[in-house]
Design a protein with these regions (language model features):
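Conserved beta strand-loop-helix elements of the APE1-like EEP
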Residues: 80-96, 219-240
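Surface-exposed cleft-lining segments at the edges of enzyme active sites
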Residues: 26, 101, 125-141, 173-178
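Metal-dependent phosphoesterases centered on the DNase I-like endonuclease/exonuclease/phosphatase
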Residues: 141-228
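N-terminal, active-site-proximal structural segment of metallo-dependent hydrolase catalytic domains
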Residues: 1-66, 77, 82, 267
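Active-site beta-strand termini and strand-to-loop segments that position acidic
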Residues: 89-90, 113-116, 223, 234-235, ...
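Structured beta-strand-rich core segments of catalytic domains in phosphoester-bond hydrolases
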Residues: 56-128
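Active-site-proximal beta-strand elements of phosphoester/diester hydrolases
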Residues: 3-18, 117-130, 160
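Active-site beta-strand/loop signature of hydrolases that rely on acidic residues for catalysis
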Residues: 6-10, 39-61, 120, 147-171, ...
């Protein structure tokens, strides 16, 4: 039975992450030459088959290849220091596609990688708040749903990344409402799950757990934060017991923490 491990992490800038030690602190040049950074430590300790990063903020391909993964694909923005996603893997992709049909802005927010048994859609949804709520709900979300539905006609889909949405009140503990927690954005998220017959893997395995993927250090110390990062998988996979792990990992260096998905499925 094949076993696949995926990790997703909004790293809030690849350049800065490569200078962080495993505790999230900044390293000087001398330390960086002799000590593994937090991203290298994560990859070495967890050994993901597929690594999905968001908000890499690279305008051109970085020389850093994650632990010499065989295949590394980027979708980069033309705007310096903004957005960008990356998928690194030891598995040979069959195809790679960028962006979403119907979305004119080229912000490097989506990359779709096809493997033998499934697609991985690595996504960094826009955090736009009330100023562009209409765009988020009426343009971005429908385009993402259509993209998933088209791919589903061929094989299963793993949608992962920072989707910038708080599905329920169980998924946040904050003193004020943040973008992503509006009624409209929540409705769009659940519409995606319903119309694509998909499930939130973490919530499926941990229906009552309060745990958060986003929040600064001072927020974490107070038990505050929000769950903005997800692995969305076919409901049929969840019901068949294909998901054997979906949880958060304690690695620092970003305002997000990484999440991991473990799959065990029959060929």
């Amino acid at each position: 039975m094949p076993r696949i491990k995926l990790i997703s992490w909004n790293i809030n800038g690849l350049g800065g992450m490569l200078k962080k030690n495993p505790l999230g602190g900044c390293m000087n040049a001398a330390e960086a030459r002799i000590q593994a950074n937090v991203l290298e430590t994560l990859v070495r300790q967890e050994e993901p088959d597929i690594l999905c990063l968001q908000e890499i903020r690279c305008t051109e391909k970085t020389q850093w290849m994650p632990m010499k993964y065989t295949y590394t694909n980027y979708n980069q923005t033309s705007r310096k220091g903004y957005s960008g996603v990356l998928v690194a893997t030891h598995l040979a992709p069959l195809s790679v596609a960028y962006d979403l049909e119907g979305i004119e802005e080229k912000e490097g927010r989506v990359i779709t990688v096809e493997f033998e048994d499934f697609f991985v859609v690595n996504c960094y949804s826009p955090n736009i708040g009330s100023r562009r709520l209409v765009y988020r709900v009426n343009v971005w979300e429908p385009a993402l749903r259509r993209h998933i539905q088209r791919l589903q006609q061929r094989k299963g889909i793993i949608l992962c990344g920072d989707l910038n949405v708080v599905p329920t009140d169980l998924d946040m503990n904050l003193t004020k409402t943040i973008p992503g927690a509006t009624e409209e954005e929540r409705k769009a998220f659940h519409q995606l799950l319903d119309e694509t017959h998909s499930t939130d893997s973490f919530r499926y395995l941990h229906p009552n757990t309060r745990q958060y993927t986003w929040g600064g250090l001072w927020m974490r110390q107070k038990g505050q934060g929000a769950r903005l990062d997800f692995f969305i998988v076919p409901t049929s996979w969840a019901e068949a017991g294909v998901i054997n792990r979906s949880e958060m990992l304690d690695y620092r260096g970003s305002d997000h923490i990484p999440i991991v998905l473990g799959l065990a499925y029959s060929k």
